[in-house]
């Protein structure tokens, strides 16, 4: 896999084709996800009425399902959207927000996975581990520090990808991405991502943008994660001593735009693992 060549081609397609990304997302981070989608070159639509799912999906290039503020009506819309997308050959990305903290979330996410409706899962270690084991025992939506050792995260990414026949992107201080056969380890990013709301949700949006223009879902997931990581590093470099998470979030949006319009691979050094 020549990632540098493939990433460059995908970024060019993303900026030129402006794919439509249908977000069925949570109300906490919806605006941030729409903004980051536009900055990367995509075109967001945030529809969640079950009655219009078929029509909306017909005009989309990727569907992103984010269960952060799940309810029964959204579940109907999300499952319908995923089913229509699969019929049309449109990639579906799942962000299993807080799946380890609620049996409702866990059961719904597993239902989508077991029906083979998902192409890529992007979540933190605790979320992906809960999906793999089928157990919810966490707290809130943030990843638990224990278990984020590289070996454990890599094991979870590979095992979950193999179990559910899709790509798993386990993101954290170090990112682990696998399709069950190949695995990538990425070291981009910045600690300030932990101090803003929606960094994971926005990463999932970037993954969806890349999936919309890609044939290889492993490459798409990796590129979305890389764009966020490089943008975070660049945004942090622009901060002054008086700045904090608020300024960082504004800079992050700017830097996603700059990273995808003035693409460079200087900081990209993924470790590939079999």
Label each region the model flagged.
Residues 1-46:
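Glycine-rich phosphate/adenosyl-contacting loop at the front of the ribokinase-like
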Residues 5, 230-274:
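Charged C-terminal helix
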Residues 36-89, 94:
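Active-site cofactor/substrate anionic-group-binding motifs, chiefly glycine-
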Residues 74-123:
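Glycine/small-residue-rich loop that forms an oxyanion/phosphate-binding "nest" at active or ligand-binding sites
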Residues 105-183:
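Conserved phosphate/ATP/ADP-binding segment of small-molecule kinases
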Residues 184-197:
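Short pre-catalytic strand/loop immediately N-terminal to key active-site residues, enriched for Gly-Thr
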Residues 197, 207-247:
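Conserved post-catalytic alpha-helical subdomain immediately downstream of the catalytic base
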């Amino acid at each position: 896999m020549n990632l540098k060549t493939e990433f460059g081609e995908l970024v060019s397609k993303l900026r030129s084709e402006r794919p439509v990304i249908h977000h069925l997302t949570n109300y906490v981070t919806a605006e941030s996800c729409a903004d980051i989608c536009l900055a990367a070159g995509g075109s967001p639509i945030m529809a969640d009425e079950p009655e219009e799912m078929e029509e909306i999906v017909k005009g989309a290039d990727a569907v992103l399902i984010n269960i952060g503020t799940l309810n029964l009506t959204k579940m109907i819309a999300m499952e319908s959207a995923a089913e229509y997308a699969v019929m049309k050959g449109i990639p579906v990305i799942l962000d299993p927000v807080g799946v380890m903290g609620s049996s409702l979330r866990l059961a719904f996410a597993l239902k989508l996975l077991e029906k083979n409706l998902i192409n890529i899962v992007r979540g933190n270690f605790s979320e992906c581990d809960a999906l793999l084991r089928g157990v919810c025992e966490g707290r809130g939506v943030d990843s638990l520090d224990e278990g984020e050792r590289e070996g454990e995260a890599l094991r979870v990414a590979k095992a979950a990808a193999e179990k559910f026949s899709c790509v798993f992107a386990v993101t954290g201080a170090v990112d682990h991405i696998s399709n069950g056969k190949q695995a990538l380890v990425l070291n981009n990013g910045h600690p300030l991502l932990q101090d803003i709301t929606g960094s994971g949700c926005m990463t999932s949006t970037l993954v969806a943008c890349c999936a919309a223009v890609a044939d290889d879902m492993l490459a798409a997931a990796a590129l979305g994660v890389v764009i966020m990581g490089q943008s975070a590093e660049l945004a942090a470099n622009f901060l002054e001593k008086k700045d904090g998470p608020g300024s960082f979030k504004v800079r992050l949006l700017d830097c996603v735009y700059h990273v995808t319009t003035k693409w460079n691979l200087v900081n990209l050094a993924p470790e590939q693992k079999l």
